[in-house]
Amino acid sequence: MVIALSHLGYEKNSTLNYYDRGIVMNTRHIDMIIGGHSHTFLNYADYVTNLDGDKVPVVQTGSKGICLGYAKIKISKEGRLSFNYKLIPVKSHLDSKLDMAFSDMIDAYSATVSAKMDEVIGTCPSAIRKGSPESPLGNLTADALIWMAKEYYDVDADVSLYNTGGIRAEISAGDLTIGDVYAVYPFDNVLSIATMKGRDLKTLFDYVASSGGMPVNAGVRLVISGDKVKSVTVNGRQIEDNKDYKIATIDYLMNLGRYGLQNATSRNDSPDIIRDCFVDYFRHLAAENGGKITAAKDGRITKNQ
């Protein structure tokens, strides 16, 4: 039996090449897909036909722990599957009926984790906000990727790019802890360094413009008019179509296989989770600036109406 655990989304959308229903339609031998990403509440399994003409159940339980999914699968002696699925609402009034032995076990781990998460990296004199087309936190994030490429791989990246949706929280004024950094960058992405031709880099900036702006490094100057690129320079120069440029980004964007990134070469992915790399970067900033961590907008992205 093959059960696929997916975080692609239930139905096709504008940003993903693949999605749960489409995976079934274009494959064989998957017996069930348990999906995520789109936060779809499926009260009943959606049976989608695969390439062999078999009906494959696709299920998803919504979001925020509101429901549990229950699936009962039976395999006959002949190898045939029968399937029963339902959503079970999680009832908050049962919270008082905790298994104390289990709770005590969790508490022991929580104390260890909390001690690590509460470790102070530095101090932020003021809040560091996110937003589009440009923001202090977006700039800090993109510049961090440039630093990582140099620090870990001795690569002088020309461009860095981070997805706006990957920045999930803002940084408050005061002490910055490891837990705060994990809240800003909660996903298990990794640093990805690659080489792109200038023509593909232009395509990538078209995507940035159509998205209303995304975190890019200080070497970029991008002017957006409406949702189009009006002008863009890298390190003070126009982009040359046949020139090679080094880009530092994350595997999530690389794996989309779009916006010119699909043509990138010499890709190298870090073995380290990106949020731990951000912890290193913030430690570096604090060490260089008397314990302080700051960020600001500097005009790297301008949007004209």
Mark where each language-model region is.
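Short, ordered loop/turn segments at secondary-structure junctions
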Residues: 7-8, 37-39, 164-166, 252
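Sec/Tat-exported extracytoplasmic proteins
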Residues: 6, 27, 37, 62, ...
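Short, Asp-centered acidic motifs that coordinate Mg2+ and/or phosphate
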Residues: 1-3, 31-32, 57, 159
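Divalent metal-coordination and catalytic microenvironments
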Residues: 3, 33, 37, 73, ...
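Hard-cation-handling environments
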Residues: 87-176
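Short acidic, glycine-rich surface-loop motifs adjacent to enzyme active sites
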Residues: 1-13
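Active-site-adjacent helix-turn-beta-strand microarchitecture at beta-sheet edges
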Residues: 14-116, 213-216, 223-225
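Feature captures C-terminal
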Residues: 48-56, 67, 139-305
